[in-house]
C-alpha cells in the first residue's frame, strides 16, 4: 500500500545534517584532521617539555582525541583537577580505574582551548613544580 516499514529517525538525521554542515564550514575532513594534529601536537609538546608531566601512551600510539598524562604524585593530580576546574576547565580527571589526567580534545574543541590549557599547565608547574 506504499507505506514505510519503519519511521526514519528524523531527529538523528537532522543532527547528522548539522554536523555535516559544520564539518564543511571548517574546511572538510582534511582541515579538521590538520587542526586535530595541531591541537594534539601543542598539548603533547607541553607534556614532553620538562618531564613534570608524563604521557601515559607510547609516542607512536598517542591519541589525537584523548590525551592522558600523569603528574609526579596523586596528590598533585588531585590539586590539578581541583585548580583546573576552578579555572574553567572541565572533565580533566582521568578514568576512575586508571587515574591521572585526561584531556579530551574532540573535533569541535577549539584550538584556543588547547592554548589555554597549556598555559594553565605551565602556571601549575611553576606553582607546584
Where in this protein do the model-derived segments appear?
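A short linear hydrophobic-aromatic micro-motif
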Residues: 52-56, 88-94
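PLP-dependent enzyme catalytic core of the Aspartate aminotransferase-like
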Residues: 86, 95-129
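Active-site C-terminal subdomain of aminotransferase-like
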Residues: 1-45, 58, 128-129
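Short, well-ordered beta-strand elements within core beta-sheets of diverse protein domains
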Residues: 24, 67-70, 105
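Conserved PLP-binding catalytic core of the aspartate aminotransferase-like
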Residues: 53-84
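Generic non-transmembrane alpha-helical segments
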Residues: 22, 42, 46-50, 79-88, ...
